[in-house]
């Protein structure tokens, strides 16, 4: 059954920082439609785990297998956002779709379909009137939502997000998490989010991974 085949799988994962193991023997697998919330105290290794899942950081033990097919199997939203401040908001959003088009295609501008998708996403994220503004003039919350639009336009099968709603109020946070779930479901993908709010985890996630600051093998994985 294709729906049951894992898109992302971690086996016996262990990462050490300085002389301390953040976690060891960590394992889970995510299939299409899954939303994994990663929780735990500060310093327990949540961001480090995300970096190892992208392949940016090599684990000291175990392995990560990204089995997603497509042009962009994995997309990320990190806390530093990595937006181009000297560009307009719409340009930052559209840059997410660059990987799906050749250089010649975008030499004289993006296809109309991409612009339409971008504007629709900006509207869903409350940025409809911000498209022509310089990114540097946006608030932190607006920039966070813009980074989300850019990553969604890249259409990754597996989306990894480090506290994607940290700068948003509760209403916007729930709207954004619902949007992420909706888009990943449409593309038969999976979602991994570092979250702090218990209510958000219970409302949106399908699975929860809890990391421990005290014990490297004190992590737990459960269905929500």
Question: What spans do the regions from the language model cover?
Answer:
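Q-loop/switch helix immediately C-terminal to the Walker
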Residues: 86-105
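Conserved ABC ATPase signature
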Residues: 134-138, 142
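Conserved structural motif at the start of ABC-family nucleotide-binding domains
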Residues: 8, 22-25
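Catalytic Walker B motif of ABC-type/P-loop ATPase nucleotide-binding domains
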Residues: 159-162
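H-loop/switch region of ABC-family ATPase nucleotide-binding domains
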Residues: 195-196
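Conserved ABC ATPase "signature" region
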Residues: 106-130
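Helix-to-loop junction immediately C-terminal to a conserved catalytic motif
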Residues: 54
């Amino acid at each position: 059954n294709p729906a049951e085949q894992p898109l992302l799988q971690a086996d016996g994962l262990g990462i050490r920082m300085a002389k301390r193991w953040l976690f060891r023997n960590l394992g889970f697998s995510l299939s299409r439609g899954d939303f994994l919330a990663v929780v735990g105290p500060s310093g327990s290794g949540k961001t480090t785990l995300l970096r190892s899942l992208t392949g940016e950081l090599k684990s000291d033990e175990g392995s990560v297998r990204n089995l997603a097919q497509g042009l962009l199997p994995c997309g990320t939203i990190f806390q530093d956002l990595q937006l181009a401040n000297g560009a307009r908001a719409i340009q930052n959003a559209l840059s997410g779709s660059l990987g799906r088009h050749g250089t010649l295609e975008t030499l004289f501008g993006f296809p109309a379909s991409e612009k339409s998708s971008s504007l629709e996403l900006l509207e869903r994220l409350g940025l409809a009137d911000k498209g022509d503004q310089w990114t540097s003039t946006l608030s932190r919350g607006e920039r966070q939502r813009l980074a989300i639009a850019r990553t969604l336009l890249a259409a990754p099968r597996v989306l990894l997000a480090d506290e994607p709603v940290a700068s948003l109020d509760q209403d916007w946070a729930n709207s954004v998490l619902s949007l992420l779930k909706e888009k990943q479901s449409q593309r038969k993908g999976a979602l991994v989010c570092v979250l702090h709010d218990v209510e958000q985890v219970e409302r949106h996630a399908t699975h929860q991974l809890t990391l421990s600051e005290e014990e490297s093998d004190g992590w737990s994985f459960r269905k929500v």
